[in-house]
C-alpha cells in the first residue's frame, strides 16, 4: 500500500514524508483496526497479546502510539510533522512521519466528518495523481472540497511540536463548561 500510494500521487517523500508515509499510515491503521476485529489471530492482535504478557497490562494500538510519542517527546526530542526526512532523528522518522501524522490525519477526519474527509481525499487524489503535489496542493484541494479554511491544520498543527494544552472548567452554579486553549497549535475546540 505504501508504494502504491506514493507511486500514484508521486509526492516528494524526502521533503514531505508526511504526505506519503503518514497519510497512508492513517488508512493502514483504519484497515488494521477492522482486521483485528474480524480476525483476533491477526499479526497485530498477536503483538498486542505479547506486549500484554511483557507489561502486565493490555496495550491497544492507541496506547502503543501514545507510549512511542512519550518516548519521542522525552527530553524535548519531538519534531514537527512538517520536517524533511533527513532532519528527523532515526527514531522520530518512524514515530512522527508515520504515526504522529496518522494521528493528525485522524484528528482532521474527526473534525471534517468521515464523509466530507473521504470526499476531500478522493478529490485530492483525482486532482493530483501522477503530478507531484506539494503541501499547498493538498491544503488547497481539501479547502476547495470542504469550503473551509484549514490553515490551523496544514500550517499550524503540522509545523509545530508544541503540545496542545486545553483547560476544561465546569461551574455547578450556572451549569456551564468552559474549554480554553492554554498552549499549542490553534486547533478547533469543537
List PLM regions with ranges.
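Hydrophobic alpha-helical and helix-loop surface patches within well-folded domains
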Residues: 1-188
Amino acid at each position: 500500500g505504501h508504494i502504491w500510494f506514493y507511486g500514484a500521487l508521486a509526492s516528494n517523500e524526502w521533503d514531505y514524508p508526511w504526505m506519503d508515509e503518514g497519510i497512508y499510515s492513517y488508512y493502514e491503521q483504519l484497515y488494521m483496526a477492522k482486521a483485528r476485529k474480524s480476525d483476533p489471530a491477526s499479526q497485530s492482535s498477536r503483538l498486542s497479546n505479547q506486549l500484554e504478557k511483557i507489561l502486565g497490562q493490555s496495550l491497544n494500538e492507541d496506547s502503543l502510539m501514545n507510549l512511542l510519542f512519550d518516548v519521542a517527546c522525552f527530553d524535548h526530542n519531538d519534531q514537527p510533522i512538517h520536517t524533511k526526512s533527513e532532519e528527523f532523528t532515526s527514531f522520530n522518522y518512524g514515530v512522527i512521519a508515520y504515526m504522529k501524522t496518522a494521528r493528525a490525519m485522524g484528528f482532521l477526519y474527526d473534525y471534517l466528518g468521515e464523509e466530507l474527509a473521504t470526499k476531500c481525499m478522493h478529490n485530492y487524489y483525482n486532482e493530483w495523481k501522477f503530478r507531484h503535489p506539494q503541501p499547498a496542493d493538498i491544503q488547497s484541494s481539501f479547502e476547495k472540497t470542504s469550503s473551509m479554511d484549514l490553515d490551523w491544520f496544514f500550517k499550524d498543527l503540522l509545523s509545530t511540536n508544541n503540545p496542545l494544552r486545553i483547560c476544561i472548567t465546569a461551574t455547578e452554579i450556572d451549569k456551564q463548561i468552559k474549554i480554553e486553549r492554554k498552549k499549542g497549535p490553534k486547533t478547533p475546540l469543537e
